[in-house]
Amino acid sequence: FTAFNFKNRKGYYNKVWREPDAAAGLAWLQYISWIKYGDKKYLNATRQCMAFLQNRPQKEGTFYEIMMPYGAYLAVRMNAELGTAYDELKMLNWCFDGNNSDRDGWGVMCERWNKYDVHGLVGQKKDEQYAFAMNTFSQAAALVPIVKYNPAYASTIGKWMLNLAN
């Protein structure tokens, strides 16, 4: 879908593009609701959204623009807190590598543009090549906390943050 109408409880497709990472954003909202209210319906909704991401093939990355990092965060957090077995690396790679089926090229820069170092910025890695500060800040806000749930990512996330600060 392109969007979800919460009032009508139906997905919406604008016949131009799809944003499959909306499942990640919705999963995050539902998980936080479960933590706050304790109602299992929120956890069940989280699991449905995460199942969509988990069952999607690696080659069909879901990162459209801003929500997938929240799904990657949840994969790491739920694996730590609930003992789930979500494919953390697959979801994290979707946030970085730029190989996404619905917005190919969207990921994290690993290069210089002429004399400018753009390593770590989030945006379009292929074709036009452009990056956005707010997308970068949002991705950092979603992914830095994963080191709390899986310290094995601390070095990698730290290196990415160092590049952002450069």
Predicted regions: what is each one?
Residues 47, 132-134:
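Amphipathic, non-transmembrane alpha-helical scaffold segments
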Residues 14-17, 24-38, 69-83, 127, ...:
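Well-ordered alpha-helical scaffold segments within catalytic/enzyme domains
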Residues 22, 64-65:
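Extracytoplasmic catalytic/substrate-binding loops of multi-pass membrane glycan-assembly enzymes
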Residues 1-17, 67-85, 108-132:
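Carbohydrate-binding/catalytic loop surfaces
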Residues 15, 19, 61-62:
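Alpha-helix N-cap/helix-initiation motif
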Residues 1-10, 35-61, 86-121, 156-166:
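Long, well-ordered core segments of solenoidal/helical folds
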